[in-house]
UniProtKB/Swiss-Prot annotation:
Reactions catalysed according to its record: 3',5'-cyclic GMP + H2O = GMP + H(+)
Annotated SMART domains: HDc
Residues bound to a divalent metal cation 2: 254
Gene name per UniProt: pde3
Native source organism of the sequence: Dictyostelium discoideum
Ranges annotated as biased composition (Low complexity): 1-120, 135-150
Protein name per UniProt: cGMP-specific 3',5'-cGMP phosphodiesterase 3
UniProt note: phenotype after gene disruption: Shows a moderate phenotype with increased basal cGMP levels, but only a small effect on cAMP-stimulated cGMP levels.
Length: 466
């Protein structure tokens, strides 16, 4: 069996049903103060919190209405200020770009030549004039990513130096709304801005205020996905359902993260470790929370315009994408992707799925794409989580995780090692298929060199963010 078939078969075994199963009953992981003093919320508890936040969502809707005009003005400013990036496309022009398993049968080479929007014969197709306007907006943004020295403002989703550190939760939600809008999904799937706002608000409330694994991280990862799709011109190639799937998965991939790793959950014999048989414990937990939100009233409103088949494909992709963020399986996915590069076909749905997986996995560890000062902040945040876990491991007489021990970690060396082992090879593989990502690879190399010559205590840690 071909390597890509192996991995897709493995992924598809997670659930044969086209729709998500009901959420597991009470997955509360409750340790007392002598053990962890840290709870991993159950899906039921998360649902209760979601209900409590509905009133807040209504307030956010009102605030969003006031901000819409500002968003539009900022979008125009983004378009005017963006620096054009030359797109180099290694993929042969005679490759058919597109039949995915979403029933999108009309994608072809005309997608890149004519920059047609990817509406794919939806029943409620937009009027021709609106479609042309949407295409023009997409084209004005494609391959226009702000330079490395730009200031970050509240709506600067086009900047490689996007930073969520100084942003409030409302600002981050606004960034998320803009990413949906600039991705073309409003018109392609007839999504309403209010449903997206409500969804993002409930997602934001389902993240904990961790040093690293927080809503800030989720939006940073999602913005990286946005930049990748923009820079590679894949907004004009991927189907609307593929785009929706990876954006939703990016935003939700660390929901209710306890800032304690899979290894810790397993060694502690936590409730979620038992529930998921010690396999991708946190990733399954994040997925459960995500599916609970998507199955709620707010989720149903968000997906109300999708057909039955589109929902089936959407849920399938969200599942495989979130589960793929388990770094224990990193090299397996990397090898599977490398094996298909030379024969990659846009007509092969498994190839497309694996490409999306590599996008999300790479974006999840992409702090080194930012300027050094921004990535340095992420470094310290992740180290804070790691050191806290190490303290708890000692307190509970658990096996110590080597790269988390305060006394042994040399941060700049740890960072260089991670870049060389995980981050850089991932982006180099993506560049082999999509040459326009060369700038991203060069930025990673530049930051690696800074770490190589830096013995300070500051470092951008990228060790397994699970």
């Amino acid at each position: 069996m071909a390597p890509q078939q192996n991995i897709m078969k493995q992924l598809q075994q997670m659930q044969s049903s086209p729709y998500p199963s009901s959420s597991p009953s009470s997955t509360t992981v409750s340790q007392n103060n002598d053990n962890l003093n840290h709870n991993v919320h159950s899906l039921n508890n998360s649902s209760n919190n979601n209900n409590n936040n509905n009133n807040n969502n209504n307030n956010n809707n009102n605030n969003n209405n006031n901000n819409n005009n500002n968003n539009n003005n900022n979008n125009n400013n983004n378009n005017n200020n963006n620096n054009s990036i030359n797109e180099k496309n290694k993929i042969n022009d005679n490759n058919n770009r597109g039949n995915s398993d979403d029933g999108n049968n009309n994608n072809s080479n005309n997608n890149s030549n004519n920059n047609n929007s990817n509406n794919n014969n939806r029943d409620d197709e937009e009027e021709e004039g609106d479609d042309e306007d949407n295409n023009n907006n997409n084209n004005s943004n494609n391959n226009k990513i702000r330079g490395y020295n730009d200031n970050n403002d509240i709506n600067d989703i086009f900047s490689i130096n996007f930073s969520s550190w100084s942003k409030s939760k409302d600002n981050l939600i606004e960034n998320g709304v803009l990413i949906f809008e600039e991705s073309g999904l409003y018109k392609e799937l007839n999504l309403s801005k209010s449903s997206i706002l409500n969804f993002l608000s409930i997602v934001a409330s389902s993240y904990r205020n961790n040093p690293f694994h927080s809503f800030n991280h989720a939006i940073a990862v999602t913005q990286t996905i946005f930049l990748i799709l923009l820079k590679t011109n894949l907004f004009n190639i991927l189907s609307p359902i593929e785009k929706l799937s990876i954006i939703i998965a990016s935003i939700c991939h660390d929901l209710d993260h306890p800032a304690l790793s899979n290894r810790f959950q397993i060694n502690m014999k936590s409730s979620i470790a038992v529930l998921y048989n010690n396999k991708s414990v946190l990733e399954n937990h994040h997925l459960s929370i995500c599916l609970g939100i998507l199955e709620s009233k707010i989720g149903n409103e968000l997906l109300s315009t999708l057909t039955v088949e589109e929902k089936k494909q959407f849920f399938r992709r969200v599942k495989i994408l979130i589960l793929a963020t388990d770094m224990e399986n990193h090299f397996t996915y990397k090898k599977q992707f490398d094996d298909i590069i030379s024969t990659f076909s846009w007509d092969n749905s498994e190839h497309r799925d694996l490409l999306l997986i590599m996008f999300l996995k790479s974006a999840d560890i992409s702090n080194e794409l930012r300027s050094f000062d921004i990535s340095n902040k992420w470094a310290n945040a992740l180290m804070e989580e790691f050191f806290n876990q190490s303290d708890l491991e000692k307190l509970n007489n658990l096996p110590l995780t080597p790269f988390m021990e305060r006394e042994k970690v040399v941060l700049h060396l740890t960072q260089v090692s991670f870049i060389e082992k995980f981050l850089l090879p991932s982006y180099q593989s993506l560049q082999n298929l999509l040459p326009s990502l060369e700038d991203f690879v060069q930025r990673i190399i530049e930051n690696k060199e800074i770490w190589s010559n830096n013995g300070s205590s500051s470092s951008t840690t990228s060790s397994s963010p699970n």
